[in-house]
């Protein structure tokens, strides 16, 4: 709820990151707008991960959670209303299609640009990413394409979160587009090379090792040094028992409760 958002907490932050999924339901939509208002009031950088998931907009069945794109003008118009509020917008090619309301990427990007002067980061999968300031080029190739890390893909879960964490780690510290993209692509590449999501996120020590390797590491999961670094450089904390409720899995939990009486 909007009243649950802490202005003081947001004011203490360098950046506020919100995903597009949060705008798909009314309650979280209002809470997100409240958070954005606080961020703007305190000059906190505002970041949107478009994160388009058709199933969470009611455009795909529950069994189609992996579906990444379904064109829908209502969703496009809904997303376009909030685009002007952000300083940085990140998405895949398909996610910019929904944001721009077109199935042609460049046309979609031009529509987004008409709505916001934000920096746009287009994720290009294994190719890497491109960062767009100002006018949209005639071809993406006319701008800088920052290459991805070539690895054996074992699991794509968490790739987008890892990419964003890497990019933001540079961006909030005023790093160059090239450095932000290098960090983002490396984080995404390492996560997809592992059989995990959040626990697979790399540390700075792992990134340094990857960047300084004299040869490309295409199988990070088989690199003994990387495995060791991931074990010993991830901060450890003894947490008390946690009970976590994921809002996008409510119906499954309700069914379990009903079956259990």
PLM-predicted stretches and their roles:
Residues 1-3, 69-73, 102, 224-228:
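Short gly/ser/thr-rich secondary-structure transition/capping motifs
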Residues 1-20, 208-216:
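Conserved N-terminal subdomain of the carbohydrate kinase-like
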Residues 5-6, 79, 153:
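Acidic, amphipathic alpha-helical patches
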Residues 8-11, 82, 113-114, 234-239:
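Solvent-exposed alpha-helices and their adjacent loops that cap or buttress functional pockets
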Residues 15-111, 118, 126-135:
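Conserved beta-alpha-beta core of the PfkB/ribokinase-like small-molecule kinase fold
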Residues 37-41, 74, 101-224:
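Conserved phosphate-binding/catalytic region of the ribokinase-like
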Residues 216-261:
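Alpha/beta catalytic barrel-like cores
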């Amino acid at each position: 709820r909007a009243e649950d958002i802490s202005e003081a907490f947001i004011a203490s932050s360098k950046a506020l990151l919100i995903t597009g999924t949060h705008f798909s339901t009314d309650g979280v939509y209002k809470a997100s707008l409240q958070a954005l208002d606080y961020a703007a009031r305190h000059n906190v950088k505002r970041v949107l991960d478009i994160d388009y998931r058709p199933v969470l907009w009611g455009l795909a069945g529950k069994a189609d959670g992996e579906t990444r794109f379904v064109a829908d003008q209502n969703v496009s118009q809904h997303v376009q209303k909030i685009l002007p509020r952000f300083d940085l917008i990140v998405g895949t090619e398909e996610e910019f299609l929904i944001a721009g309301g077109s199935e042609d990427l460049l046309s979609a990007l031009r529509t987004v640009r008409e709505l916001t002067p934000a920096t746009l980061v287009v994720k290009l999968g294994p190719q890497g990413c491109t960062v767009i300031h100002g006018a949209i080029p005639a071809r993406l190739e006319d701008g800088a394409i920052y290459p991805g890390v070539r690895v054996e893909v074992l699991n794509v879960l968490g790739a987008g979160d890892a990419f964003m964490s890497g990019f933001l780690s540079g961006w909030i510290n005023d790093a160059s587009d090239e450095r932000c993209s290098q960090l983002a692509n490396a984080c995404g590449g390492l996560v997809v090379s592992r059989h995990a999501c959040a626990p697979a996120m790399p540390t700075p020590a792992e990134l340094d090792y990857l960047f300084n390797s004299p040869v490309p590491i295409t199988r990070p999961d088989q690199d003994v040094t990387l495995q060791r670094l991931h074990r010993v450089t991830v901060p450890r904390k003894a947490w008390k028992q946690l009970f976590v409720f994921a809002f996008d899995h409510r119906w499954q939990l309700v069914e379990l409760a009903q079956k259990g009486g």
